[in-house]
Amino acid sequence: MAKFELYAEVDVSISGHQYPVIICRNGLIDPELINRFITSKQVLIVTNRTVAPLYLGHLQSVLPSKQCDVVILEDGEEHKNQRSLSTIYDSLIQNKHHRDTSIIALGGGVIGDMAGFAASTYQRGVRFIQLPTTLLAQVDASVGGKTAINHPAGKNMIGSFYQPQAVIIDLNTLKTLPEREFRAGIAEMIKYALLVGGSFFERIQAVLQQGLTVHSPELPLLIAECCQVKAKIVEQDERESGVRALLNLGHTFAHALETYTDYKKWLHGEAVAIGLYCAAVLSEKKGLLDKPIVDQVEKMLIHAGLPHKIPNSIDLIQLRELMSLDKKIKNNCLRFVMIKKPGACYIDDSVTEDCLHNTLINVVEGEQK
């Protein structure tokens, strides 16, 4: 059996609950590691049709003494809904899982969100473990305890904050990740670079210029640093009443774009990439961000092979209406995460309709800035 190899461990401590984020290789097939976080005789693995043929058997093999039930869901953001959630509940109930059971999320952000939400609500809360298999889930979605399903009206409208027992990031799972999915995950890394600034921003810029791949030697520690940044923020503000909202940089635009296209045109990270560019242009329009930084953001997204413009087929008025469902809204006021410079972002509730409209027009494909 391949030997377990640890790269880094990030500790997250929220509301008296502490858990590790373990960045490693061969963790998925290490019985000692997995069973450290499984305290009961019952386990439900939630995965999807893409990941199951690749890794489900490996995970089951390290749980031979457990009642190990499995739910295999359809793959894709469009399946992050009440029907899929009910499938998880049905399996838990039909297989007589008790309150001491553990749910394992084996997959990307969609699986983690749904399995986590099921764990937070089944019998008022059971243990769960995140085994993220996409770069986006590893650097962002699996850490911090956000769980949710989508509603036809908008993304992540129904959810909870519920922390896992552990996040085990086995970097070997990235070897089977499609190139497009890998690039989508880079968008969240660029987001962290903009939030943190300094040397981290410069390093992300440099590795993207060189060409960041799954084989890049810098990747494990970059993932660990992203997890550290997120852990530090969510430890201060678990329920997004303050500083955690900064993690939504670019997401007001991204979620509206995803909802507009029924989650069928872009992966989440691709929509975030467009949203980051929109946020940079909006910040420039408000006189906050220098144009050379906007150009740097654009180049980073291009180097990452990500989209950054809104297609001219999108109805901007309808897109603006969808932004009205944004979860950062307070007192009926739409709030945006703005960029003064890399490392200096803040929440702004004073963006005028004219400024927003001009921004949207300027980020449409084929339009001149």
Swiss-Prot record:
Question: What main location does UniProt list?
Answer: cytoplasm
Alphabetical keyword list: Amino-acid biosynthesis, Aromatic amino acid biosynthesis, Cobalt, Cytoplasm, Lyase, Metal-binding, NAD, Nucleotide-binding, Zinc
Its UniProt entry gives the catalysed reaction(s) as: 7-phospho-2-dehydro-3-deoxy-D-arabino-heptonate = 3-dehydroquinate + phosphate
Cellular localization per UniProt: Cytoplasm
What is this enzyme's EC? Answer: 4.2.3.4
As one GO molecular function, the record gives: nucleotide binding
Co-factor requirement: Co(2+); Zn(2+); NAD(+)
Q: Binding positions for NAD(+)? A: 75-80, 109-113, 133-134, 146, 155, 173-176
Q: Which GO terms describe its biological process?
A: amino acid biosynthetic process; aromatic amino acid family biosynthetic process; chorismate biosynthetic process
Keyword Amino-acid biosynthesis applies: yes
The top EC class, named as a word, is lyase
Q: Which domain of life is it from?
A: Bacteria
Task: Extract the NCBIfam families matched here.
Answer: aroB
- Name the HAMAP family for this protein: DHQ_synthase
Q: Which family does it belong to?
A: Belongs to the sugar phosphate cyclases superfamily. Dehydroquinate synthase family.
Protein name in the entry: 3-dehydroquinate synthase
Q: Which organism is it from?
A: Legionella pneumophila (strain Lens)
